[in-house]
Amino acid sequence: MALTLRVLCPDQNVFDGQADEVILPSTTGQLGVLPGHVSLLTALDVGVLRMRDGNQWTAIALMGGFAEVDDDEVSVLVNAAEPASGINAEEAQKQLSEAEQAWSKFDGQPNSPDKIKAQQAFQKARARLQATKAN
């Protein structure tokens, strides 16, 4: 028995298919979902969704949102998502380095819109790079 997984963004359907296992980046930590999982609704952090089909693992970088698990269906609604297969690892590493430098300029400073924006850019860049390493 498998899970039906849907990953949806406002502008696209990123994934719609079957998976034997799904690992979600919830705001309280990694959340594993197998067939027969109890129903739940959870907030998702910026991070990597991992799904297993047989022995094959696939990753999708998620940019925050929500997930619902109900009757072996996992619906993931996110602000943005990018399959690892579409991410250039070298470019992702470069973006992470740039985002880390931009964020480090705010060390020791109180929160400001610019600091929060830099932190979010860092988290997104890190998720993209992690997704390339998850496959």
Swiss-Prot record:
It comes from the Bacteria. It is found in: Cellular thylakoid membrane. It is a peripheral membrane protein. GO terms for molecular function: ATP binding; proton-transporting ATP synthase activity, rotational mechanism. InterPro entries: ATP_synth_F1_dsu/esu, ATP_synth_F1_dsu/esu_N, ATP_synth_F1_esu_C, ATPsynth_dsu/esu_N. Residues 91-122 are annotated as: Disordered. Its main location: membrane. Signal peptide: none annotated. Belongs to the ATPase epsilon chain family. Produces ATP from ADP in the presence of a proton gradient across the membrane. F-type ATPases have 2 components, CF(1) - the catalytic core - and CF(0) - the membrane proton channel. CF(1) has five subunits: alpha(3), beta(3), gamma(1), delta(1), epsilon(1). CF(0) has three main subunits: a, b and c. This is ATP synthase epsilon chain. It comes from Synechococcus sp. (strain RCC307). The lineage of its organism: Bacteria, Bacillati, Cyanobacteriota, Cyanophyceae, Synechococcales.
